[in-house]
Amino acid sequence: MDGCTAVLMDAASAATETSAVPEAWGGDVAPFSVARVTSTDIEEQAASLNGWNQVYEQMTPGRFVGKLHELRFSGVQLFRETSNQAVHESGTPWAGSRAVGVPIEMDSTARFGGQPVDTDALVTLGPADELDFYTPRGFDILGLAIDADVLEAHARQVEHRDIAAVFGTRCVFKPGTVRLNEFRRSLLSVLQSLDANPTALQFRQTQRVLEQTMLGAVVAVVADEAAAPEVANPRRRHIVDSAKDFMRSRIAETITVADLCIELGVSRRTLQYSFQEVLGINPIRFLRAMRLNGVRRDFKNPGPLASSVQDTAANWGFWHLGHFVTDYKRMFGELPSETLRHTRRSATVARP
């Protein structure tokens, strides 16, 4: 792995593959870890999830096989865990975190905090909550643990919601099929994309974009769908103009929708409606266009990070390489590799 250390450990009961960037690295390189674990020992499976204090007890007879795929960076931990036997799980996530989970597949109904859980449910633990989870055979779940204070601040500043009040003391949510499927797809997309391109996580901009994506996804899946307050047209024009000024003043940075909401003091929905009415485009597409142009500028003026399409894209917050290539070609009519190749060819010709 480029710029990372890789360790492969094999044991009779577990195979663990981990990759990480050391905490001591500075500059634009950010610490992260990626782990894949296959266990045939239930205690080792319980201990595999980084930062959690767990006890697993096998409840059905037969050889246990469990798997874990985990990403951790900044204040975000994203994982997918599978087990073939029924298990009772108890314990706590890492201190100060809000954890949510969405089942992908199960042979029968699970129980979380004593409540029945199927694939149409989302489960959650707050910072002071303890895990009490009975999982059936053939269980497959996506989990996300994120700093609770950061989540509450994001919900308050960007979404204008009190997410702590939304969660309350509830441990099981039924968000509805559409919202839950969207949340599930979002988490799976991140895991699968970074499995193919884990070095994208070494860039702080990528981590920042992913963190805000995860924060927004959690708020969206559990928050009630309340109507956004009406904003007068002149106010919307001012919001859009101010947003554009802010983006242009920080053209070298990866600005996100959350940054705009905080800077302008408006909710995500107000920003969305304002851009749609004034420009006929949503702020996400507008920001993506600005970032694509930023990547193209780097290709045209190559520095150390322009040595590869993958690294340059990741430095601008494009963590999904396939989506980036598609968006880039749609925007500029050529592949990013073609732009970079043209630039290198021109530099060679211009050389005396």
Model-predicted segments: where are they?
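Short, conserved beta-strand element in jelly-roll/cupin
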Residues: 93-109
